[in-house]
Amino acid sequence: MTDTAENQTQNNWQAEHPRSIRSFVLRQSHMTAAQQRAIDTLWDSFGIDYQATPADLDANFGSNRPKILEIGFGMGTATAEIARRLPETDFLAIDVHGPGVGNLLKLINENHLENIRVMRHDAVEVIENMLQDGSLDGIHIFFPDPWHKKRHHKRRLIQAPFIAKLLPKLKTGGYIHLATDWEEYARQMLEVLSSFDSLQNTAADYAPTPDYRPETKFEARGKRLGHGVWDLVFKRMG
């Protein structure tokens, strides 16, 4: 796919999926030949097409292992590493960025990973229309765009209405794991999650980084800039 074709695909996607305020932008980035080849050859095995009807995740994965939703995986490096570290857990990874989708599929193939399925779609629509209540054992959202300008804060993904959409999909005892390198956003995340009676913080405030989460490029970048990194892990109690 050429840059022009990729950009046209993104423009078509935006036209077909209008929403007043989005937490992401469709970056017009170059799709490498290897990334496009991965999409062309591996999507049928590891990709899931969006449908506006409830999905059977066990059927999609061919297993009844625990299911983790990962929203916004970037280039997929951390996602592939987490899946490698947790082979008895299935990961549904969602992003709208074409090169990232292609790269994650490439990593799945190179690392012989059977426990990842990939979607290229708006996560909000997937949550609303495809995921059944009580179908998830965990949710990972690592380094979402902080939209640091105050006038853009309304675009931040982690807000109460979004968490309210997620909670019914999470099993009792399931968890939400967030991470950010933006301190003010970390405070907002803590405030939002703490506002739900059905969620219990696993730490006094911010959690130690779990062993399964590798350092991402965003985390490394933040550390180089002198930023801290904050993990939050909350469990659903009921």
Curated annotation (Swiss-Prot):
UniProt binding sites for S-adenosyl-L-methionine: E70, D95, D122, D145
Pfam families found in the cross-reference section: Methyltransf_4
MF GO annotations: tRNA (guanine(46)-N7)-methyltransferase activity
Active site (UniProt): D145
Alphabetical keyword list: Methyltransferase, S-adenosyl-L-methionine, Transferase, tRNA processing
Biological pathway: tRNA modification; N(7)-methylguanine-tRNA biosynthesis
GO cellular component, one term: tRNA methyltransferase complex
Catalytic activity of the protein: guanosine(46) in tRNA + S-adenosyl-L-methionine = N(7)-methylguanosine(46) in tRNA + S-adenosyl-L-homocysteine
Keyword Kinase listed: no
EC number(s) on file: 2.1.1.33
Binding positions for substrate per the UniProt entry: K149, D181, T216, K217, F218, E219
InterPro entries registered for this protein in UniProt: SAM-dependent_MTases_sf (IPR029063), tRNA_(Gua-N-7)_MeTrfase_Trmb (IPR003358), tRNA_methyltr_TrmB_bact (IPR055361)
Family assignment from sequence similarity: Belongs to the class I-like SAM-binding methyltransferase superfamily. TrmB family.
Summary of the function given for this chain in its UniProt record: Catalyzes the formation of N(7)-methylguanine at position 46 (m7G46) in tRNA.
Name of the molecule in the record: tRNA (guanine-N(7)-)-methyltransferase
